[in-house]
Structure formats: structure tokens, C-alpha cells
Amino acid sequence: SKSIGGACIGVFSYYLSSPFNLLLLLFDKSQLVLFVHVIITLKLACAAATFAFYLNRRFEEWNDGSVKKQALIIFLAVSYAVSQYGIAQACNIMWLDGFYMLPLIMLGVYRVVNGGRPVMLSVSVALAVLFNWYMGGINCVFACFWFLFEFAYSRLYSGDTKAEKTVIKILPENLDGLYIQCWREF
């Protein structure tokens, strides 16, 4: 049997390790309902912000300063945040951490596929797992599928035949984020 709080590590890492939970210190006990509403709003706003960041970096050709294109990015980012998943999971605010981390993981995959540095992918996966290990794991599974999409899309338009290098590179970088989180098991 676990003692000295050992059983609490699983509870903490599943329910409580979101950085937004630190905001609870700013609220009185009587304002708990307000706190939950603020957290939901902040997490959905963070989802919109990370998706806008993803769109700006992934589709750099959109960054010509055009008001129409920036309005489209804002529209798509807000649409992502208030999608059915985002609204439905407002009842389970712990799932929203993976929701706002997903665009950063997608951008990390894009950068690795296109020969960029893998730091963003590793750090994003590590943070997603840190914030909620279950959704972080789901995000890792999605990252594998997203890699296949980005890889196929990239090779379709570039005609690059040196695919093995990218395939060999993506798996360790995705796993690095998981390895960073191994401290929880000790």
C-alpha cells in the first residue's frame, strides 16, 4: 500500500496539474463557481490563441498583412475554441488542457516533417502530458496520425524522396516529451 501521499500523485497528475488551477489562489471559497467559469473561459481563449498561432506559423503565406486573411485566422481560431468538443468538455475542464495544447503539437509535427528543429514538438508533448496525462496521451496518438498527413502532404508537393530521415526523426521526438514526464513514476 502507498503511504506518505503516494496515492495522491495519480490524482494530482490526472485532475489537478493544470497551470490554470493556480488561479484558485486568487478566489475565495464562496467564489468557486466563478472560478470554474473563469477557468473555462481562459482555457477556451487559450485554445483560440494557440490555434491562431498554429495557423500563422503553419500557413505563413497568409501573413501578408491583409485584413481579410487575419480576420479569417481569427474566425477559424474562435471556431476551433467554441467547437462542439470545446463546449461539451466545459463540463470536464481537465480535458481542455489537451485541447489548447493540440495546435502546438500539430505545429511541432509540421516543423519536424519539414526539417525544422524538434524542440517545439518535444516540449509541447511534455507539457500536454504534464497538464493531463490522459489527454496528453491522446494528443500523442493524434500526433502520429497528423504526422502521416503532414508527411504525405509535404512529399506530394515537394517530391522529396528522402523520407526515411523524417520518419526516423519523428518517433524519438514524440517520445522525448513522454520521457520528460517519467519523473512521475518515481
Where are these regions (language model features)?
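Membrane-interface coil-to-helix junctions
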Residues: S1-A48, V78-F99, I138
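Alpha-helical structural context
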Residues: L22-F27, R58, V112, L130
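Membrane-interface segments at the starts/ends of alpha-helical transmembrane spans
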Residues: L25-D28, V125-A126, N174-Y179
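Membrane-interface starts of transmembrane alpha-helices
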Residues: D28-I39, D64-L76, R117-M120
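Membrane-embedded helix bundles of polyisoprenyl
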Residues: L44-Y54, K69-Y153, Q181-F186
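Membrane-interface helix-boundary motifs at transmembrane edges
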Residues: N56-K68, V112-G116, L156-V167
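Hydrophobic alpha-helical membrane-interfacial segments at the cytosolic entry of transmembrane helices
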Residues: G159-F186
